[in-house]
Design a protein with these regions (language model features):
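Bacterial N-terminal signal peptides
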Residues: 13-25
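Short, conserved catalytic-motif segment at the N-terminal edge
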Residues: 36-104, 126-131, 186
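Active-site SXXK
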Residues: 45-49, 63, 69, 104-130, ...
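Short, surface-exposed loop or secondary-structure junction motifs
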Residues: 79-81, 86, 144-346
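Short, well-ordered beta-strand elements
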Residues: 351-367, 486-489, 498-504
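Short, gly/Ser/Thr-rich active-site loops of penicillin-recognizing serine hydrolases
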Residues: 367-443
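Short solvent-exposed beta->alpha transition segments
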Residues: 426-470
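Exposed beta-sheet edge and beta->alpha loop/turn motif
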Residues: 467-507
Length: 507
């Protein structure tokens, strides 16, 4: 019997369609009994993780590799929690080891699960992806013109409420979902629905609220009962309602190249439905296996999830429903679909890659918000899952703009001036918006100054790329020293004030 689901409009039906510590308490832990990687492959994976962790000063990595639609490799490295002397990254006997049962905050990988929750409801005929938001939340801007599909693929036009790559002091205090929607989803749109693409967490807060409106249940309960439990995930927790916190990794960040510092916690409800899950690498891998096997949803649902959305004029977005989508070259000489999503939240970075037709996946979870360990590891591990090593993992689709030569020179000159002053322990607060100014504490300034001192003189600042997001202009800049390069992620508000000025190592 063929089943049908209403994924489109009421008139259109679609057929069913991964630095091992030297001390014994912190030896890397693995489930070797279920590890079919051969000795050479396992050694290559271990060497890659160990090298990248040591180079980037990352406390812990948890890694899962899926091959043949089965978890083929599951291993954790390093310290889930550092000793109280956090000025020293090398784990000591008082550090808590990471294990394969350690949970990490997965950040925006959570969006994959929110998209799945919506698709469960679509599969059951309880909503259509082309229902307008007004059916559930009529008070929101553009609600009668924006569809649920446009929420999930980021073509709605709603501004991103959580665009900073740090947690402002105001977001360390509790909020409510309704307050987020009132403040951010009742503003003018960034563009007309469907006409452009901008990544926005606001879309997924709205989607999570729609789940609650339809089901009459808290979003978390519906997700557990209808997405997680059916595919064997029983060990997750949520940032707002943590269980067994002693099993969770502690997150760390740093200022420039300074020592790891305890990352602040995000206030209650700020992560709702868009970045709130905390999971083991195994749990994320179980989700990936379900995507590969299409075991939770109907085939039309997976087709919708994995199909790249287009703007109204046919432009690319690089995004499906809850996943970035791209084609990537395999070691077999063919092109293969890759679904992936990065996650970054206070103290954590992660990345999930799924290759459905290769029946493979890679999950990389870390408790360091600094450095790009996940991307570095992904590039080194691609051959293990049948992808050409030279192939890059792919950057997020971004709406870019081209500054004039005068603007480009001004951006580079200001960043150069700010860096010169920071190297002297000074901050030009007149250039900073309140959120950014609050991040430059005395501890932060000292860490930056001390870590920059060994680099010598700053020779040049170079603007690499630009992006528009959440009503801000994003600038990626390279800092060129004699023997090293750093990078800046700068976000500017409409008034020209700097909302973010983060300094990190450059891969």
């Amino acid at each position: 019997m063929t089943t049908t689901i209403q994924l489109a409009s009421s008139r259109q039906w679609i057929g069913l369609c991964l630095f091992v510590a030297l001390t014994p308490p912190l030896l890397a832990q693995a489930l070797s009994a279920t590890n079919p990687l051969d000795r050479v492959e396992s050694s290559q994976v271990d060497d890659a993780v160990r090298t990248v962790m040591q180079r980037n000063n990352v406390p812990a990595v948890s890694l899962a590799i899926v091959r043949h639609a089965q978890i083929a490799y599951l291993k954790a490295y390093g310290a889930a929690e550092l000793s109280t002397d956090i000025g020293h990254i090398h784990p000591t006997r008082s550090s808590r080891a990471a294990s394969v049962s350690t949970r990490f905050a997965i950040g925006s990988i959570s969006k994959e699960f929110t998209a799945a929750a919506i698709l469960v409801l679509a599969d059951r005929g309880q909503l259509s992806l082309d229902d307008t938001v007004s059916k559930y939340l009529p008070q929101l801007t553009g609600a009668s013109r924006i569809t649920i599909r446009e929420l999930l693929n980021h073509t709605s036009g709603y501004l991103d409420y959580f665009l900073q790559e740090y947690i402002p002091a105001r977001m360390q205090r509790p909020t409510s979902v309704d307050a987020i929607l009132k403040a951010w989803a009742q503003r003018p749109l960034a563009f007309l629905p469907g006409e452009d693409w901008q990544y926005s967490g606001t879309n997924y807060v709205i989607a999570g609220r729609i789940v609650e409106k339809i089901t009459g249940e808290p979003y978390e309960k519906f997700l557990e009962d209808n997405v997680l439990r059916p595919i064997g995930i029983t060990d997750e927790t949520f940032a707002d309602h943590p269980s067994q916190p002693e099993r969770n990794a502690v997150g760390y960040y740093r200022f420039a190249l300074g020592p790891p510092r305890l990352a602040p916690l995000t206030g209650r409800n700020w992560l709702f439905a868009m970045a709130d899950l905390e999971m083991t690498a195994r749990d994320v891998a179980l989700w990936d296996v379900s995507v590969i096997n299409q075991s939770l949803l109907c085939s039309a649902c997976y087709q919708a999830m994995s199909s790249e959305a287009k703007t109204s004029n046919g432009g690319p977005t690089g995004y499906g429903l809850g996943f970035f989508v791209r084609q990537i070259a395999g070691t077999d000489g063919k092109q293969h679909l890759m679904l992936h999503h990065p996650g970054e939240i206070s103290g954590f970075r992660s990345h999930n890659f799924v290759l459905p037709d290769l029946k493979a996946a890679v999950v990389i979870l870390t408790n360091a918000e600094y450095s790009d360990t996940t991307s570095e590891l992904a590039e080194q591990l691609q051959s293990v899952v049948g992808i050409k090593p030279a192939e890059q993992s792919g950057a997020d689709t971004a709406v870019s703009f081209i500054p004039s030569a005068v603007e480009e020179n001004a951006i580079e000159a200001r960043a150069h001036r700010l860096m010169l002053h920071l190297a002297q322990g000074l901050v030009d607060r007149a250039d900073l918006a309140p959120d950014a100014s609050e991040t430059f504490t005395r501890e932060a300034i000292n860490d930056i100054r001390k870590s920059l001192a060994p680099l010598g003189d700053l020779e040049r600042v170079k603007l690499d790329s630009t992006q528009l997001r959440g009503g801000t202009k994003h600038y990626a800049l390279t800092l060129i020293y004699h023997r090293r390069k750093l990078q800046i992620a700068e976000y500017d508000l409409a008034d020209g004030k700097i909302e973010q000025f983060l300094i990190d190592d450059k891969p």
